């Protein structure tokens, strides 16, 4: 039913694209399921029953959230502010996808964060008819799947909906950009100056979702870019720290910098990675004979990364009908 090649259906600008598998010419009646299954890139839906409504646009940023107020201001809030600055005429709203974090922030700080459902209801009540959703996820894993599902559940309520891809999505196939390389070029400004005995370990979250395979792609691109002293590992997926330590020893590295590649520098960065407990990554590496430094900053603090999220917002807005 689907051909082997990917064809770009719409090109909105440099690096902006929404793609789909090219359907075989023999397919006469394209079912909604087939159309949905063949959609790649920015997702977009236009509700035929609401086309008479006036366009009133909003951007909704979806994030897992964090209970760390200091890193929230430097990361999530900073990304949202950057998107708002890039689109001054379109209001930016926010939704937290973690109900646990919503409850903890409310209890600790008295701040009420909205769930995605609450945010969509607010937008509907305030008369917004077109909503561009921007996910602050790094890869298309379990959390991005949740963002996708909950957005698609709103199709009957809005004239148009779109959902941007996460930070990394396309991998340079069929003329698409290699967003893994784009990501590495954005974060390499954080890497310390390294000598022959120095290595940097970038810590990802990890997931049981098949999207975990992106970490292998990241390592492949790291090597292709000649970053032979940079290694990716994850807290809850593969590769993990135990997979990387033998590589460090085999190459004779003695000094290691640990650095998270997560939106926020929250619990995983402060405790799992840089904590003083014997099972923290810092402690494990120190016990293994390495001198360890830590870089405790979330991706949202990086201006280059914020620029990539602005681009994701641009792509989601560009999907709307003119």
Model-flagged regions — what are they?
Residues 1-19:
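Sec-dependent N-terminal signal peptides of Gram-positive bacterial secreted proteins and lipoproteins
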Residues 21-257, 263-322:
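Extended amphipathic ligand-handling, pore-lining, and cofactor/metal-binding catalytic surfaces
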């Amino acid at each position: 039913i689907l051909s082997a090649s990917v064809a770009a259906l719409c090109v909105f600008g440099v690096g902006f694209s929404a793609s789909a598998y090219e359907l075989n010419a023999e397919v006469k009646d394209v079912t909604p399921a087939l159309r949905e299954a063949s959609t790649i890139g920015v997702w977009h839906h236009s509700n035929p029953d609401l086309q008479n409504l006036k366009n009133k646009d909003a951007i909704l940023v979806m994030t897992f959230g964090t209970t760390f107020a200091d890193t929230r201001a430097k990361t999530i809030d900073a990304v949202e502010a950057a998107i708002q600055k890039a689109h001054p005429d379109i209001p930016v709203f926010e939704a937290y996808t973690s109900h646990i974090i919503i409850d903890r922030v409310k209890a600790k700080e008295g701040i009420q964060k909205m769930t995605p459902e609450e945010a969509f209801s607010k937008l509907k009540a305030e008369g917004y008819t077109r909503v561009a959703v921007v996910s602050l996820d790094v890869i298309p894993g379990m959390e991005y799947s949740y963002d996708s599902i909950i957005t698609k559940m709103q199709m009957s309520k809005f004239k148009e909906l779109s959902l941007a891809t996460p930070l990394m999505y396309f991998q340079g196939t069929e003329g698409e950009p290699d967003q893994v390389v784009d990501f590495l070029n954005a974060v390499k400004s954080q890497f310390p100056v390294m000598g022959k005995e120095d290595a940097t370990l970038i810590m990802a979250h990890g997931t049981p979702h098949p999207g975990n395979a992106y970490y292998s792609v990241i390592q492949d691109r790291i090597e292709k870019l000649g970053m032979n002293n940079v290694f990716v590992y994850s807290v809850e997926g593969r590769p993990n720290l135990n997979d990387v330590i033998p590589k460090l020893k085999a190459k004779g590295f003695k000094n290691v910098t640990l650095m998270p590649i997560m939106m926020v520098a929250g619990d995983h960065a402060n405790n799992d990675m840089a904590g003083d407990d014997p099972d923290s990554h810092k402690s494990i590496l120190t016990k293994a004979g390495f001198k360890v430094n830590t870089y405790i900053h979330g991706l949202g603090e990086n201006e280059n990364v914020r620029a990539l999220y602005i681009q994701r917002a641009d792509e989601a807005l560009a999907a709307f009908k003119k």
